[in-house]
Every structure is written in structure tokens, then in C-alpha cells.
């Protein structure tokens, strides 16, 4: 049986966004190996049929010794597994596993799930990462991108020319994220679903919550996600939670019940996204989305039809769009969500994404 190795940085992301791909690969059939740090979703991935290779590393770590250990671990896994095709996601697997696959002449497919702060910019770290990407993707068979801005960035840098392909993000599972009836009764509720960190726009969300509740005091602003250790606004955040201005639920396994009770998802991110899964999932459930007018976010919304686009890092603009939504009749808010669901069905069905990957893997293994 042919072997496919998937290298990624986070078990929750692999399970939540690529479970359907794994199911399709196993059914094909391929022997599926996964290399990533241990976590609570690993047992479920094993139950699906994946063979787990623990690969401990810190996603944001910059210790050279730790990075060398990771490269050595990846090399041992390649020796042990002898995969026919490797799929890589996120920066460190893309860079290190990509370079090793190129050296070992193993076909590999790289996915750019967003530039990330280590790539976007002009600093020394960004220049080094871009240089490493050029080396890592030199022999990539396919380079998948989730938005045109990211693809253009790599094209302008001359990275993996001629092998770029576009995907509608990770897509969205339209069965799990099914349409949810609109909550016509009770106070309007807004939802922020993300890691609590500056780049995800939490400060703008807090600013908007304060401003909106002065005019509409019954409005609910809820937050789902874990609090990043290095978030500098922790003191203000905790104070606003204690005052009841926002409601913090922490990290939850299933966001659907929270989306069901909300009227709109707010995602004011200025993080270099590939394609915002938060926006896709919320729209699939039939909820309006307010998000930033930047790559990875703007593609998920038809401005004024399925939600609103706002300027990056602009609390006043975000507040104005939330106010505009609140001043719409209930029927128009509901219709905005229904149109979002239709948009997801036509353009972002995860089955589209799975087919792209499966076609690439089948083609590469057939050539061997």
C-alpha cells in the first residue's frame, strides 16, 4: 500500500480542518502517517487509522538547537516511513520537511495556510524565512494557496513558479456546519471566535463592545478561544470580563451551539490569514460575518450582502458596522445570513478541497 505522510504543527487543526481529507486518503486506500506534536486530538486521529509519529516542537520557538532537533526528527521519520508522498502545512513543516523531501527526492505537496508574521514584513526574520521558503519549495510538486494575495507574494519572490494552485481555503464541512435557525428573540449577540491575541483584532472587538453597549446595553459580546500567554492586553481583557462587557467562554470543542445563539460573527483580524475558517464556518451556519478587508478575510464575505468588511485596526469602523447591523430589521439580518450560507455552498464546500488534494496524491503516486 502506498504511504502518505502529513506534517503539520497542531493536532486540533489537523482534525478539524483536514479530517475529511484523511478519510478520503484512507478509503483510497493509502497508509496515512502523521508527524506533529502530541495533543488531545491524537487519539481520535489514531482511531481514524492514522499512524502517529510524535514530533515535539514549539510553533513560535526560535531556539536554533530546538530547530535542529526538529529537522533531525523529521529526517528520522522519513527514513522510517519511506513515504510515497508528503503533505506539509504551516511554516516549520513547510520549511524543514520540504527541504528534506527535496534532498531525498520524495514528492511533496506544500500548502500555504497564510503568510504568518514570520513571513510577512521586511525584518531580518522575514527575509530569512522567505529565503528558506525559496529553498524548501524549489522541488515541491505542487504549492497550494488559499488566497490570491499570498500566491502573488510567492510569485513575486520567484518561489515555486509554475506549480501554484488555488484552493478555497480549507473549505467548510457543510453537514457539520449546517444552517442554524436565526434567533429572532432575545438580545442581539455577537461572537468572536479566535485565539485571544492582538493580531486577531481582540482590542478592536473590545473597543467596539464598550462603545456599542453604551447605546445598546443589552447587546451580548461573547468570546471563544484560548488566551495567548504573550497577550499584552490581559489586564484590560480580564477587567472587561469581570464588568460583564464581554463574556469569555475559553476554548470550546464545538462552536456550533454558540453560533446558533448568535446573530453575527465578528472577526477583525489583521493576522496574515490563509483563509479564515471562523468566517467560513459562521457563514455556513447562516450567520452574517463582519471581518477585515484584507487577504484571507475579504474573500469570505460579499460586502453588504453576507456581512460587512471593515478597515484593519480601525475600532471606529468596526463599531459603525456593528451599529449598522443592529439597526437593520431582524428579517434583513436573517437574510444576510441565508445569503452567506448560499455563498458557502457554491464556493467553499470542503469536498472541493479534498478532491484537489486527492487528485494531486493520485497523480504523484501513479508516476512512481
What are these regions (language model features)?
Residues 134-179:
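Donor nucleotide-sugar binding/catalytic pocket of nucleotide-sugar-dependent glycosyltransferases
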Amino acid at each position: 500500500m502506498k504511504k502518505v505522510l502529513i506534517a503539520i504543527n497542531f493536532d486540533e487543526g489537523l482534525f478539524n480542518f483536514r479530517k475529511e481529507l484523511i478519510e478520503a486518503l484512507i478509503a483510497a486506500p493509502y497508509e496515512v502517517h502523521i508527524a506533529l506534536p502530541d495533543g488531545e486530538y491524537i487519539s481520535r486521529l489514531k482511531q481514524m487509522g492514522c499512524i502517529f509519529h510524535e514530533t515535539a516542537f514549539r510553533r513560535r520557538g526560535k531556539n536554533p538547537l530546538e530547530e535542529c532537533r526538529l529537522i533531525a526528527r523529521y529526517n528520522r521519520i522519513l527514513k522510517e516511513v519511506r513515504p510515497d508522498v508528503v503533505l506539509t502545512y504551516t511554516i516549520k513543516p513547510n520549511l524543514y520537511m520540504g527541504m528534506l523531501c527535496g534532498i531525498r527526492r520524495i514528492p511533496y505537496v506544500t500548502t500555504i495556510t497564510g503568510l504568518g508574521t514570520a513571513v510577512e514584513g521586511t525584518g531580518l526574520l522575514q527575509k530569512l524565512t522567505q529565503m528558506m521558503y525559496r529553498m524548501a519549495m524549489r522541488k515541491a510538486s505542487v504549492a497550494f494557496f488559499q488566497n490570491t494575495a499570498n500566491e502573488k507574494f510567492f510569485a513575486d519572490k520567484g518561489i515555486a513558479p509554475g506549480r501554484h494552485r488555488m484552493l478555497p481555503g480549507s473549505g467548510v464541512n457543510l453537514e457539520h456546519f449546517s444552517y442554524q435557525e436565526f434567533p429572532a428573540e432575545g438580545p442581539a449577540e455577537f461572537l468572536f471566535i479566535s485565539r485571544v491575541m492582538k493580531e486577531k483584532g481582540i482590542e478592536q472587538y473590545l473597543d467596539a463592545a464598550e462603545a456599542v453597549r453604551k447605546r445598546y446595553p443589552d447587546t451580548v459580546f461573547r468570546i471563544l478561544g484560548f488566551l495567548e500567554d504573550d497577550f499584552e492586553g490581559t489586564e484590560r481583557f480580564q477587567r472587561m470580563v469581570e464588568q460583564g462587557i464581554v463574556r469569555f467562554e475559553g476554548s470550546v470543542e464545538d462552536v456550533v451551539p454558540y453560533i446558533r445563539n448568535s446573530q453575527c460573527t465578528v472577526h477583525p483580524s489583521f493576522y496574515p490569514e490563509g483563509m479564515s475558517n471562523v468566517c467560513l464556518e459562521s457563514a455556513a451556519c447562516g450567520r452574517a460575518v463582519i471581518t477585515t478587508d484584507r487577504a484571507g478575510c475579504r474573500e469570505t464575505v460579499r460586502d453588504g450582502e453576507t456581512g460587512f468588511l471593515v478597515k484593519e485596526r480601525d475600532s471606529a469602523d468596526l463599531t459603525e458596522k456593528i451599529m449598522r447591523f443592529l439597526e437593520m430589521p431582524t428579517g434583513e439580518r436573517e437574510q444576510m445570513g441565508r445569503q452567506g450560507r448560499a455563498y458557502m455552498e457554491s464556493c467553499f464546500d470542503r469536498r472541493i478541497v479534498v478532491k484537489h488534494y486527492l487528485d494531486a496524491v493520485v497523480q504523484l503516486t501513479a508516476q512512481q
